[in-house]
């Protein structure tokens, strides 16, 4: 859980999108975030849930997974474990640098660049598609803490509050919610 202050410097390392329901997303020079929708022309953009597994359960539920963010730190950890995974390959729209996304509380707002603002809704739930993408990778993005509780390391999900264009190199400003903080849970 979050303990401390927001980072002094965080940046967007990469941006990606895909119009198809594919596991990986294609790197872009910039992506346009649309308020209440997600990434323009991305398969997961929409007011209601767009992830196929969620649509099968209830297609009318709100889309709390409009945008997927992963820290570049995960990519480096994967390299140390023998997995070279390019930005966007795990399905993330935004790769960040310099902010521990998993330690932030639910409701944290991230200003991406000059205009766009997203609000963290929860943790990405790593699924079998990660293992299908690369054998052994699922075990790298799941772990256990000291108490034995499951730890998800495959990024966080967010909704878009304010639209705008986001590019690699854009600064990220972190705005914490009013305490008490709530731990990010699977969405």
Predicted regions and their residues:
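Metal-cofactor-dependent catalytic cores
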Residues: 1-187
């Amino acid at each position: 859980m979050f303990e401390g202050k927001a980072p002094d410097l965080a940046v967007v390392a990469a941006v990606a999108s895909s119009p198809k329901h594919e596991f990986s997303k294609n790197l872009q020079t910039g992506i346009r975030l649309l308020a209440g929708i997600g990434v323009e022309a991305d398969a997961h953009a929409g007011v209601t849930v767009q992830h196929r597994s969620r649509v099968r359960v209830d297609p009318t539920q709100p889309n709390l997974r409009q945008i997927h963010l992963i820290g570049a730190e995960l990519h480096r950890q994967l390299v140390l474990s023998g997995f070279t995974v390019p930005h966007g390959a795990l399905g993330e729209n935004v790769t960040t640098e310099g902010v521990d996304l998993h330690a932030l509380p639910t409701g944290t707002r991230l200003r991406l660049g000059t205009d766009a603002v997203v609000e963290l809704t929860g943790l990405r739930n790593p699924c079998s598609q990660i293992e299908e993408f690369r054998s052994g990778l699922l075990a790298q993005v799941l772990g256990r803490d000291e108490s034995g509780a499951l730890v998800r390391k495959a990024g966080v999900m967010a909704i878009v509050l304010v639209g705008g264009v986001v590019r690699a190199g854009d600064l990220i400003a972190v705005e914490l919610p009013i305490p008490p903080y709530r731990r990010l849970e699977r969405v």
